[in-house]
């Protein structure tokens, strides 16, 4: 239930985001949502870092801590990080340029445990020469795991994982997804 102040802010057009945090093996997870869906999933070293990141991404929004209201979103993301079994499927409030949204929607269609390249993704969205722009859209992606840019690789693997969230946090996720697929296939055979 929205507070009276939140109802007034909505009428005035003030953007309201509720957020909560949780620990995971990759660091602190912050999920922020609006009335339209999840507006950000951020990963960082501590609560202060992810809150600063949220504030920098949404400087004109009314940010409200709401651990209880974000609990189900946090649980889905943390469960995915701890033991990936399927895609993170949350209703998103996609915020970005038209091009970024096009990239992010295409990234969401990359199958669990599979990867593609920036080059292939650029071709897929109909902009084969926009490889760098596709990479930039992945770099600024505020929807960690729900828009799985960790599955998009540079054609030279040594240059991959340039996401803001960092190589050490994102690199293991593709391997974890592929391991889950292998284990699932092994269980079916047995």
Language-model segments: which ranges?
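Short glycine/serine-rich loop segments
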Residues: 129-171
């Amino acid at each position: 239930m929205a507070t009276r102040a939140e109802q007034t802010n909505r009428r005035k057009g003030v953007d309201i985001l509720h957020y909560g945090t949780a620990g995971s093996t990759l660091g602190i997870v912050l999920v922020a949502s609006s009335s339209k869906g999840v507006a950000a999933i951020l990963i960082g070293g501590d609560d202060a870092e992810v809150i600063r990141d949220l504030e920098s991404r949404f400087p004109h929004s009314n940010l409200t801590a709401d651990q209880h209201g974000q609990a189900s979103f946090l649980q889905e993301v943390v469960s995915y990080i701890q033991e990936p079994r399927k895609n993170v499927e949350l209703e998103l409030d996609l915020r970005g340029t038209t091009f970024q949204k096009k990239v992010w929607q295409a990234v969401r269609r990359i199958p669990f445990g599979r990867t593609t390249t920036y080059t292939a993704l650029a071709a897929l969205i109909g902009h084969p020469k926009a490889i760098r722009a596709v990479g930039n859209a992945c770099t600024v992606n505020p929807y960690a795991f729900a828009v799985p840019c960790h599955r998009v690789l540079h054609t030279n693997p040594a240059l991959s994982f340039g996401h803001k969230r960092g190589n050490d946090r994102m690199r293991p996720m593709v391997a974890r997804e592929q391991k889950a697929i292998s284990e699932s296939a092994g269980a079916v055979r047995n």
